[in-house]
């Protein structure tokens, strides 16, 4: 989120021999005004041969057409054969491009490259930071489901990872104090890591201090139980479940531990007199012991 809108950035490895042509295309697009961009776009759509040969060019033109102004980009050399291509665009809430003409500094993808290396170093497969409304939560879950379906992993493992992530994101949404306090004291985070054949699922969110003792008690009880005891605890909790957040949240925590087959590692860090920041991580192995 930036400048009253949102910055969308992608990065991917390309062959270094593609850099000159791709840079030329981007420079040509950025020299066009909005009317010229629409004209070129219509021309490319109307010429099937041109469209099939220049698919990447058509995609870039379409981005410029939809947002209304220039595309920011950078190329970082990785080695003699490969480069890292970074494409970035800042848009307002209506999807219209934002560009600060008074501060027209050359775009640099250095920070994106640092972020990519950090994600790779820590085996972070997916990360989300921001307010998790029910609608946003559904989008994060749908994106994760798509990413998991693309991976060559056992279906039963994929289903367990997905089910646990759904429970964890729903748990975050249940305790949300609202966007304003989250922006002041700590935004929710959801993260999926994959390391040594195991998935690690983590979330973080604000929770009111008045609820921390109850939550800690629930977590400690759940972590003291084995698989059979968790099933029995789930059955008993189900029989007394209500619509209260504490009740439904308890069911979700039990389900996470049961499906993961591992302990729920958690931490409660005081933020101020009103809130603490609650983080939880569980490991998902290929087999539940």
Regions found by a protein language model. Name each.
Residues 1-102, 119-123, 141, 173-289:
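Conserved beta-strand-loop-beta-strand hairpin that lines the nucleotide-binding pocket
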Residues 108-117:
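GHKL/Histidine-kinase-like ATPase module
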Residues 138-154:
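Alpha-helical phosphate/pyrophosphate-handling elements in metalloenzyme active cores
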Residues 123-141:
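STAS-typified acidic loop motif
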Residues 144, 165-174:
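Amphipathic alpha-helical interaction surfaces in cytosolic regulatory modules
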Residues 155-159:
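Short, solvent-exposed positions on alpha-helices
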Residues 59, 160, 164-168, 252:
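Conserved N-box helix within the HATPase_c
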């Amino acid at each position: 989120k930036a400048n009253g809108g949102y910055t969308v950035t992608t990065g991917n490895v390309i062959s270094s021999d593609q850099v000159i042509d791709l840079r030329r295309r981007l420079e040509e697009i950025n020299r066009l005004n909005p009317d010229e961009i629409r004209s070129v776009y219509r021309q490319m759509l109307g010429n099937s041969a041109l469209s099939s040969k220049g698919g990447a060019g058509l995609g870039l033109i379409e981005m410029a057409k939809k947002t209304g102004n220039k595309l920011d980009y950078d190329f970082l050399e990785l080695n003699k054969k490969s480069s890292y291509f970074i494409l970035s665009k800042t848009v307002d809430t209506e999807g219209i491009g934002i560009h600060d003409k008074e501060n027209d500094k050359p775009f640099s993808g250095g920070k994106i490259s640092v972020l990519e290396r950090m994600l790779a170093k820590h085996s972070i497969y997916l990360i989300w930071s921001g307010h998790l409304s029910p609608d946003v939560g559904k989008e994060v879950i749908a994106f994760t489901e798509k990413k998991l379906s693309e991976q060559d992993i056992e279906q039963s493992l994929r289903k367990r990872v997905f089910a646990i992530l759904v429970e964890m994101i729903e748990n975050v949404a249940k305790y949300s104090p609202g966007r304003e306090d989250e922006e002041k004291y700590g935004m929710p985070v959801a993260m999926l890591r994959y390391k040594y054949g195991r998935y690690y699922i983590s979330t973080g969110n604000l929770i009111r201090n008045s609820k921390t003792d109850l939550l800690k008690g629930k977590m400690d009880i759940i972590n003291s139980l084995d698989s059979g005891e968790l099933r029995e605890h789930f059955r008993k909790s189900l029989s007394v479940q209500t619509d209260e957040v504490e009740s439904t949240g308890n069911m979700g925590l039990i389900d996470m531990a049961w499906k993961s087959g591992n302990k729920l590692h958690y931490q409660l860090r005081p933020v101020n007199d009103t809130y603490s920041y609650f983080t939880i991580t569980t490991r998902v192995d290929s087999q539940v012991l």
